[in-house]
Protein backbone atom coordinates (compact mmCIF):
# COMPACT_ATOMS: atom_id res chain seq x y z
CA UNK A 1 0.00 0.00 0.00
CA UNK A 2 1.12 3.56 -0.69
CA UNK A 3 1.90 5.92 2.16
CA UNK A 4 -1.29 7.01 3.95
CA UNK A 5 -2.57 10.43 5.05
CA UNK A 6 -4.58 10.80 8.27
CA UNK A 7 -7.23 13.51 8.51
CA UNK A 8 -7.33 14.49 12.17
CA UNK A 9 -4.22 15.34 14.20
CA UNK A 10 -5.59 13.70 17.33
CA UNK A 11 -4.92 11.02 19.92
CA UNK A 12 -7.04 8.68 17.80
CA UNK A 13 -4.84 9.55 14.85
CA UNK A 14 -1.71 8.66 16.82
CA UNK A 15 -3.12 5.18 17.46
CA UNK A 16 -3.93 4.70 13.78
CA UNK A 17 -0.40 5.80 12.89
CA UNK A 18 0.97 3.08 15.18
CA UNK A 19 -1.30 0.48 13.55
CA UNK A 20 -0.15 1.43 10.07
CA UNK A 21 3.50 1.46 11.14
CA UNK A 22 3.06 -2.03 12.64
CA UNK A 23 1.98 -3.15 9.16
CA UNK A 24 4.99 -1.54 7.52
CA UNK A 25 2.95 1.36 6.15
CA UNK A 26 4.20 4.92 6.53
CA UNK A 27 1.97 7.85 7.47
CA UNK A 28 3.02 10.53 5.02
CA UNK A 29 1.38 13.35 7.00
CA UNK A 30 -1.59 14.33 9.09
CA UNK A 31 -4.19 16.79 7.79
CA UNK A 32 -6.07 19.13 10.10
CA UNK A 33 -8.14 22.33 9.88
CA UNK A 34 -6.41 23.89 12.89
CA UNK A 35 -3.71 26.10 11.44
CA UNK A 36 -1.97 26.27 14.82
CA UNK A 37 -1.13 22.55 14.69
CA UNK A 38 1.90 21.77 12.55
CA UNK A 39 3.15 18.46 13.99
CA UNK A 40 1.57 15.30 15.39
CA UNK A 41 3.32 12.09 16.45
CA UNK A 42 6.48 13.13 14.67
CA UNK A 43 4.75 13.80 11.35
CA UNK A 44 4.00 17.12 9.69
CA UNK A 45 0.44 18.45 9.68
CA UNK A 46 -0.94 19.78 6.40
CA UNK A 47 -3.94 22.11 6.18
CA UNK A 48 -5.36 21.25 2.77
CA UNK A 49 -6.48 17.73 1.84
CA UNK A 50 -6.74 18.44 -1.86
CA UNK A 51 -5.21 15.67 -3.97
CA UNK A 52 -4.07 13.60 -0.97
CA UNK A 53 -4.76 9.86 -1.17
CA UNK A 54 -5.10 7.25 0.26
CA UNK A 55 -6.69 8.72 3.38
CA UNK A 56 -8.11 7.57 6.71
CA UNK A 57 -10.29 10.01 8.64
CA UNK A 58 -8.81 9.75 12.13
CA UNK A 59 -11.65 11.38 14.07
CA UNK A 60 -13.34 9.43 16.85
CA UNK A 61 -16.73 11.20 16.87
CA UNK A 62 -18.97 9.37 14.41
CA UNK A 63 -20.98 12.34 13.20
CA UNK A 64 -17.94 14.51 12.56
CA UNK A 65 -16.12 11.63 10.87
CA UNK A 66 -19.08 11.24 8.49
CA UNK A 67 -19.17 15.00 7.77
CA UNK A 68 -15.46 15.06 7.00
CA UNK A 69 -15.69 12.04 4.68
CA UNK A 70 -18.58 13.72 2.83
CA UNK A 71 -16.68 16.95 2.32
CA UNK A 72 -13.48 15.15 1.26
CA UNK A 73 -15.44 13.19 -1.35
CA UNK A 74 -17.16 16.37 -2.55
CA UNK A 75 -13.85 18.27 -2.73
CA UNK A 76 -12.15 15.47 -4.65
CA UNK A 77 -15.05 15.29 -7.09
CA UNK A 78 -15.13 19.05 -7.63
CA UNK A 79 -11.38 19.24 -8.20
CA UNK A 80 -11.11 16.04 -10.23
CA UNK A 81 -8.70 14.37 -7.81
CA UNK A 82 -8.80 10.61 -7.19
CA UNK A 83 -9.57 9.74 -3.57
CA UNK A 84 -9.09 6.35 -1.97
CA UNK A 85 -9.82 5.50 1.66
CA UNK A 86 -7.43 3.05 3.30
CA UNK A 87 -8.17 0.51 6.05
CA UNK A 88 -5.99 -0.06 9.12
CA UNK A 89 -6.01 -3.42 10.95
CA UNK A 90 -3.65 -4.09 13.84
CA UNK A 91 -1.58 -7.29 13.41
CA UNK A 92 -2.88 -8.63 16.74
CA UNK A 93 -6.53 -8.35 15.70
CA UNK A 94 -8.24 -11.64 14.84
CA UNK A 95 -10.35 -11.36 11.70
CA UNK A 96 -12.30 -14.27 10.22
CA UNK A 97 -11.54 -14.92 6.54
CA UNK A 98 -15.29 -14.67 5.89
CA UNK A 99 -15.71 -11.30 7.62
CA UNK A 100 -16.04 -8.17 5.48
CA UNK A 101 -14.55 -4.82 6.45
CA UNK A 102 -15.38 -1.58 4.64
CA UNK A 103 -13.01 1.11 3.42
CA UNK A 104 -11.77 3.67 5.91
CA UNK A 105 -12.39 1.35 8.86
CA UNK A 106 -9.89 0.90 11.68
CA UNK A 107 -9.56 -2.33 13.71
CA UNK A 108 -7.36 -1.91 16.77
CA UNK A 109 -5.14 -4.16 18.84
CA UNK A 110 -6.74 -7.28 20.29
CA UNK A 111 -10.07 -6.85 18.52
CA UNK A 112 -11.91 -9.94 17.25
CA UNK A 113 -14.27 -10.02 14.27
CA UNK A 114 -15.78 -13.45 13.74
CA UNK A 115 -17.27 -15.45 10.88
CA UNK A 116 -19.50 -13.68 8.34
CA UNK A 117 -19.57 -10.44 10.31
CA UNK A 118 -19.89 -7.32 8.17
CA UNK A 119 -18.27 -4.07 9.30
CA UNK A 120 -19.25 -1.00 7.30
CA UNK A 121 -17.23 1.92 5.99
CA UNK A 122 -15.34 4.34 8.23
CA UNK A 123 -16.01 2.38 11.41
CA UNK A 124 -13.86 1.98 14.52
CA UNK A 125 -13.54 -1.43 16.18
CA UNK A 126 -11.50 -0.31 19.15
CA UNK A 127 -8.96 -2.02 21.41
CA UNK A 128 -10.10 -5.44 22.62
CA UNK A 129 -13.63 -5.13 21.22
CA UNK A 130 -15.38 -8.20 19.81
CA UNK A 131 -17.94 -8.48 17.04
CA UNK A 132 -19.25 -12.01 16.75
CA UNK A 133 -20.53 -14.14 13.89
CA UNK A 134 -23.14 -12.79 11.45
CA UNK A 135 -23.23 -9.31 12.97
CA UNK A 136 -23.82 -6.34 10.68
CA UNK A 137 -22.28 -3.05 11.79
CA UNK A 138 -23.35 -0.04 9.74
CA UNK A 139 -21.12 2.68 8.34
CA UNK A 140 -19.58 5.23 10.75
CA UNK A 141 -20.11 3.12 13.88
CA UNK A 142 -17.73 2.95 16.84
CA UNK A 143 -17.39 -0.22 18.90
CA UNK A 144 -15.47 1.16 21.89
CA UNK A 145 -12.66 -0.58 23.81
CA UNK A 146 -13.68 -3.84 25.45
CA UNK A 147 -17.24 -3.83 24.10
CA UNK A 148 -18.72 -7.23 23.16
CA UNK A 149 -21.35 -7.58 20.45
CA UNK A 150 -22.87 -11.08 20.31
CA UNK A 151 -23.75 -13.00 17.16
CA UNK A 152 -26.44 -11.95 14.73
CA UNK A 153 -26.79 -8.40 16.03
CA UNK A 154 -27.40 -5.50 13.64
CA UNK A 155 -26.12 -2.03 14.53
CA UNK A 156 -27.37 0.94 12.52
CA UNK A 157 -25.22 3.56 10.84
CA UNK A 158 -23.50 6.05 13.11
CA UNK A 159 -24.14 4.30 16.42
CA UNK A 160 -21.70 4.08 19.31
CA UNK A 161 -21.33 1.05 21.61
CA UNK A 162 -19.60 2.34 24.75
CA UNK A 163 -16.56 1.04 26.60
CA UNK A 164 -17.15 -2.42 28.08
CA UNK A 165 -20.77 -2.66 26.96
CA UNK A 166 -22.25 -6.12 26.30
CA UNK A 167 -24.90 -6.74 23.64
CA UNK A 168 -26.69 -10.10 23.63
CA UNK A 169 -27.30 -12.02 20.44
CA UNK A 170 -29.67 -11.19 17.57
CA UNK A 171 -30.64 -7.68 18.64
CA UNK A 172 -31.21 -4.60 16.51
CA UNK A 173 -29.63 -1.32 17.58
CA UNK A 174 -30.87 1.65 15.58
CA UNK A 175 -28.84 4.23 13.72
CA UNK A 176 -27.21 7.24 15.43
CA UNK A 177 -27.75 5.83 18.93
CA UNK A 178 -25.32 5.68 21.82
CA UNK A 179 -25.00 2.82 24.30
CA UNK A 180 -23.34 3.95 27.52
CA UNK A 181 -20.18 2.44 28.95
CA UNK A 182 -20.67 -0.82 30.84
CA UNK A 183 -24.24 -1.30 29.70
CA UNK A 184 -25.86 -4.71 29.24
CA UNK A 185 -28.15 -4.59 26.21
CA UNK A 186 -30.86 -7.27 26.30
CA UNK A 187 -33.49 -5.79 23.97
CA UNK A 188 -33.66 -3.80 20.75
CA UNK A 189 -32.70 -0.11 20.84
CA UNK A 190 -34.40 2.39 18.49
CA UNK A 191 -32.81 5.06 16.29
CA UNK A 192 -31.34 8.25 17.68
CA UNK A 193 -31.36 7.58 21.41
CA UNK A 194 -29.01 7.41 24.35
CA UNK A 195 -29.37 4.24 26.43
CA UNK A 196 -27.37 2.83 29.32
CA UNK A 197 -27.52 0.65 32.41
CA UNK A 198 -27.97 -3.00 33.38
CA UNK A 199 -30.34 -3.78 31.84
CA UNK A 200 -29.82 -1.06 29.25
CA UNK A 201 -32.70 1.43 29.06
CA UNK A 202 -33.38 4.42 26.84
CA UNK A 203 -32.80 7.62 28.80
CA UNK A 204 -33.24 10.27 26.12
CA UNK A 205 -34.36 10.55 22.53
CA UNK A 206 -31.30 12.60 21.64
CA UNK A 207 -28.11 10.67 21.03
CA UNK A 208 -25.10 12.13 22.81
CA UNK A 209 -23.32 11.95 19.47
CA UNK A 210 -25.75 14.61 18.16
CA UNK A 211 -23.19 17.37 18.49
CA UNK A 212 -24.33 20.95 18.07
CA UNK A 213 -22.02 22.05 15.31
CA UNK A 214 -22.18 24.80 12.73
CA UNK A 215 -22.74 23.43 9.23
CA UNK A 216 -19.83 25.52 7.95
CA UNK A 217 -17.54 22.74 9.21
CA UNK A 218 -18.53 20.80 6.10
CA UNK A 219 -17.60 23.54 3.66
CA UNK A 220 -13.83 23.92 3.75
CA UNK A 221 -10.56 22.20 4.38
CA UNK A 222 -8.41 24.89 5.95
CA UNK A 223 -8.49 28.63 5.36
CA UNK A 224 -11.16 31.17 6.14
CA UNK A 225 -12.50 32.47 9.42
CA UNK A 226 -11.93 30.70 12.71
CA UNK A 227 -14.91 29.49 14.75
CA UNK A 228 -15.27 27.66 18.06
CA UNK A 229 -17.81 24.87 18.34
CA UNK A 230 -19.60 23.65 21.45
CA UNK A 231 -19.86 19.92 22.07
CA UNK A 232 -22.82 19.07 24.32
CA UNK A 233 -22.84 15.86 26.36
CA UNK A 234 -25.09 14.73 29.25
CA UNK A 235 -24.22 16.53 32.49
CA UNK A 236 -21.27 18.31 30.93
CA UNK A 237 -20.18 20.42 28.03
CA UNK A 238 -16.78 21.25 26.68
CA UNK A 239 -15.44 23.44 23.95
CA UNK A 240 -13.66 21.88 21.05
CA UNK A 241 -10.42 23.14 19.67
CA UNK A 242 -10.93 25.91 17.15
CA UNK A 243 -11.25 24.86 13.53
CA UNK A 244 -11.03 26.74 10.27
CA UNK A 245 -14.14 27.24 8.19
CA UNK A 246 -15.03 29.23 5.12
Please state what every model-predicted region is.
Residues 127, 136-139, 144-237, 245-246:
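Glycine-rich hexapeptide-repeat left-handed beta-helix
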Residues 74-132:
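Hydrophobic, well-structured mid-protein blocks that either form specific transmembrane helices
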Residues 2-5, 27-28, 53-56, 83-85, ...:
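Short active-site oxyanion
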Residues 3, 7-16, 98, 110-123, ...:
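Short, conserved structural micro-motifs that define repeat-unit consensus positions
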Residues 11, 63-64, 184:
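Short alpha-helical
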Residues 1-48:
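Hydrophobic, well-ordered beta-alpha structural blocks that scaffold small-molecule cofactor pockets
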